[in-house]
Amino acid sequence: MDCYLLLLVSYVIFVILGYKKFELPIISPTMITLVSLTIVIALGYWYRYEMGTDLYFYTFIVIALGGGAILGTGYGIQRWAKLNWGDPTSIENNFDSNCYPLVGIVNLPVRYKYISMYMIFFILFSLFCVFINTTGDSDASRMTQYRDIILYPQLHPNDTRFVFINSQFYKIAWAITYVSAYVAIYNGVILNKPIFKGTGLLTIVIFFCIGSSIAMGARQPAIEIFIFMILTYLFLMVKEQYFDQVKRFLFKLIPITIISPFLYILYGILVGRHDGNNVTLQRVTELLAGGIYALNIHIWEPARTIYFGQSSFADVYDKLINFGLLPESARMAYHEFDKFGNTLSLFGRWYEDFGILGVIIMSIIVTALFSLAYEYLQRRSNGNIWTHVWTAIFLTELVSLVWAGYDDRIRALLAFSQFVIIGLI
């Protein structure tokens, strides 16, 4: 039995059922997660011969049950929301969205010129931090050193000058960029204004991508702002019932989606990653599908955890350790995968802690929280300022689900702060 093919077919069925039978919007947390995993599984299936192994049947069971739990929970929450909160259009029937431009509500005159000046300062200060904390003649080698300093500051106690200050400048730049993007996209969808032309948004985003890559030694912040912008556009388009435009936009995204992994790898050169010179389909597949193969390899020998939820709630334990409330031994010793990256796929951490039942339970909890927040925000009036605040926060969290099949950022979904944010929404 080809368990990998069986898994791929199962997830294709999940996506079709969710979109066609259950009528889940493509922007819903359930569909985002299932589509993300389906793409990753499809790449892994294509690459299975090079990997030299098939999936164990037990691995198929774990991932398939997790996907089924996500689909069932998403559909159940949608049905519950319609029965108890009504249809998403019911609150908006008498709502004239043209009377409620976001800029008018927030009274936020976005001065793109001043923002651009701050971004330039942020880039220059980040470069300053790199050059005073590293040595060498090559810019690439300096970035590699700086990235190592960012990741392991305890190993470089004398090479962290101004790094903390620059991290605060990064947070300011991050907040400014996300707010600017949300405001511009909102006014583009609701008021039919240009999103990029004449707004300066593209300049701000490009500056942020450059600055964040240098300051954090990572390419994720740059990629995630684009994912956030796409999610914001789709969320608002669905909320305004512009379904035909959504379909056209999704078709336009297909070629961008195809080339984006290659650009992601190439972008690694800027942040000191050695894989930036290996821009091949094989490398893309190793990155995106590696988590599934890693889970398959370690399915019988998961990482040994001592404390309850030590792998799943790693972020929570890290905070408690940093505050001195737990010993250093409580910190999760992650699996190291030189070839596959640092993830065990979406379900790996939950499986390490709680087994197959834990995968099902945690899939239900996370999907339910995100789906409830989504259904609630879809019914909130655009005339309420807090709707925009919570929508923007929710969409930043939703980015994690887009990474569901690949990146270890998924662990943040189980951090205590994420549950608090979604619960408050």
Describe the residue ranges of each PLM region.
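Hydrophobic alpha-helical transmembrane segments
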Residues: C3-Y11, F14-F22, G44-Y49, I115-C129, S167-Y182, Y186-L191, F208-M216, F340, ...
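Hydrophobic, membrane-inserted alpha-helices
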Residues: S10-V15, I41, S180-A184, I204-S212, ...
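Membrane-interface helix-loop-helix junctions at transmembrane boundaries of multi-pass membrane enzymes
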Residues: F22-I27, A184-G200, E375-V389
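Membrane-embedded catalytic interface detector for glycan/lipid assembly enzymes
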Residues: L83-G217, A222-Y242, P261-R273
